[in-house]
Amino acid sequence: MLSVAGPPTCDDPRLFDQCNRRLLKGHGVRWLAMPSTTESCPLEGDTIIGVPFESHVPLRSLLLDQSEPDSDPLQGADITRRLFKIRSADTSGQRSSASILINRMYARRGYLSTPLPQTQLPTRITLVASEHDDAIGTITIGFDSPAGLHVDDLFAQETGALRGDGRKLCEFTKLAMDSVVRSRRVLASLFHVAYMYAHRMMGFDSLLIEVNPRHVRYYQRMLGFRVLGPQRLNRRVNAPAVLLCLDFEHARDQIERFGGKPEFALVERSLYPDFFSVPEEASIVGRLALTQPDAVYSHLPTSQRWAGHACN
C-alpha cells in the first residue's frame, strides 16, 4: 500500500551495451558534477543516481566511469549543497534500513507493516533514497508473473479485466517517506526511477497502487492516476484501500512535457516538473541496464526485458 517515438529499439542484451554507450556519449554523460563547483565526482558502484535536493540544479552526469578509482564523493564539492542517492536495496543492511523506515512511517499512521525479505525477490525490486546512508525514502516495484500481484488479493476482478485486455501490469508498494525530509524532489525521483525500471526497461504499461481513500485526490492530481476499484479493507496494513491505475503512456507524455522543468511547478500542479528531463532519464536507464544483474529480469522474455531502449 502507498501512504516519444524514438529510434529503433535494441532487443538483444548483447548489443545493448554498445548501443547504450553511443546513446550516453551523445548526451555527454559520464559524471555527476556537484553544484556550484567545477569539480566532479564518481558515483559509487551500487548508486543508480545522485540527486541534489535543490530541484533547480541541473544534473550534469549520471553514469559511473568504471575505469576510474573510487574516491570521496564530497571531495572538492560545495558541502553546503545536499545530495541524496537512490540505490537498489540489494544488501541486508539496505533492506533493513528500508524496513525500519517503512515500519516507523506506517506505525505513525496506524498501519501494520511487514519487513522486506532478506533478499531481493525475482519479481520485486526495492529502491531506497538515502542521505549520508540514512534511508529517507523507499518504494518497491512488483512485476506481474504467474504468482500474481499483491493487489490481486483485494481486486482480482479488476486486475483480471486488465490482463484480459492485454495490459502488462506492475504495482508500486511499501512507499515510505521520512516526514522530516518532506521533499517533493525525493518523492518524484523515487517514482521516476521506479517508472524507468517498470516501463522503460521491462516494458510494463499499466501501474497499480492501493492507497488510503484520503490520498486518492493527491495521486489523481499529482501523477494522473484514475480510480479503478472501490474501497476495501486491506488486511496487510489493516486500513481501507482504493485501487488506482496509471497508464505509463500518460506518464511518459507528462515527462516529455514537464520533466526537468521545476519552474513549471506552480503552473502545472503535479510532480512531473520535479521528474528528470528526457536526456537525464535516458542516461539513468543506461546506468540501470549496465549495473543491474540479468537475474532480476529472468522471469520475462528478452524482448520485454529490454523494451524501450533507444539505439542509434
What role is predicted for each listed range?
Residues 15-19, 26-39, 146-159, 207-211, ...:
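Hydrophobic transmembrane alpha-helix bundles
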Residues 35, 39-57, 137-150, 165-173, ...:
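Short charge-dense sequence patches
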Residues 42-92:
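Conserved N-terminal entry element of GNAT/NAT acetyltransferase domains
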Residues 239-311:
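Charge-rich, low-complexity intrinsically disordered segments
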